[in-house]
Amino acid sequence: YYLVDDAYRCGLLEGTYRSSDYERNLEALSVPSEHRELLEKWKLCGQMINAANNLLAAIEKVNDANFVGGRKKEIIAEARFLRAFAQLYLMKHYAFFWDLDSKYGPLMRRVPGTLSNNNMKRSGVRETYDLILEDLDYAINYGPGYKDVFSASKGLAKGFKVEVLLLRGTDEDYAKVPELANEVLSDYEFKLEESFENVFKNGYKSTEIMFSRFLSAKKLADVDMNVASIKKLMCGKYKPNEQFLDIFNATNDTRYALTFDSVLYEQFNSTNKTLILKKLWRTDGNCPMFYMRLAQMKLFQAEALEHNGASVADVLAPLNDLRRRSGNVLLKAEDFSDRDDLVRTIFYEIVREMGLENGAEWFAAVRMRLSSGKRLISELNPVYSDDKQLAWQIPDDEVSYNTLMEPNPVFIRE
């Protein structure tokens, strides 16, 4: 779901992969509060947050002398990063993240959960951003250096800080993004691969993967049966729709041939080939997950520069860095007489470079605005007409068992 839920909301996919109604609800920007998918994601984030809070509470009781060097602070930093990661997911999906003055932020638990503290009010959006950034700043200042793609690090925390600033979206935030993104690109252990192909050919060993997840032998044994495994996710169950293919196809971008393919996936269909997400697909099912990769910093830079009113040439520069390494024709400033076309091009490059990896398409389409003031998402998904549609509903179970939880307002089409 981390890969494709938001692509459905963006109007880029068709077909079904989890249930007969869920994908249609995503497309309609209206998943009912009783739907099990909303609860499952909410619970997974809650488990991660509670695990981090339990560790943070326990480690404070351990004498500093029991740790070598700054290891205690590093462990705290790793836990605070993971808490921020989970709370950011809640913010992006269940809260009014676009409205700093909204009271509809997520549930920001900061201590271990017990029966006595189960009832808790949700935080406001402004407070939520402050708390998430506090955790990320701690991880930047005290976290460990890069160890592997499965672990938190200073540079990873700064990468997520860049995304959080874009989401919060004040003019001051946008002004900071280009330089902060450049620091992630140049000051840490990550490195852009020389080619788009190498990002995926090198898998977990790619210098560009900033954060992924580890699959145990038990999980790998189940990849051909698990509907949520990356290996099985596409496989004829869902596929790019016409709008996606207008933006990204074999004619207009060399990355397409490295992104999609058709193979004989016998566990799914032993007779006919099926469409797969080639860039992530692995025969053994150990498909890398890209919660964030370094190329996003270039895309974040382009988005922020456009917002800041930079020249067309300056906006195109980070996009062309990615086009150059993939063997595509470079974009030229003189071809853009309309600022709206520049906004659309940034979005198209996000789809071509990062499509179906981590929901980057949706959040960019929500953030970016046309000269009319309308969100770009209004062109991509005609169902959108009101910002209340941008947030999922709080799951019914949370509202039932947490008596202080206030649900999100429901959009009602007149």
Cite the ranges covered by each PLM segment:
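Hydrophobic-face positions in mid-chain alpha helices that act as interaction patches
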Residues: 174-294, 329-330, 343-345, 353, ...
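Active/binding-pocket-proximal capping segment
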Residues: 298, 314-328
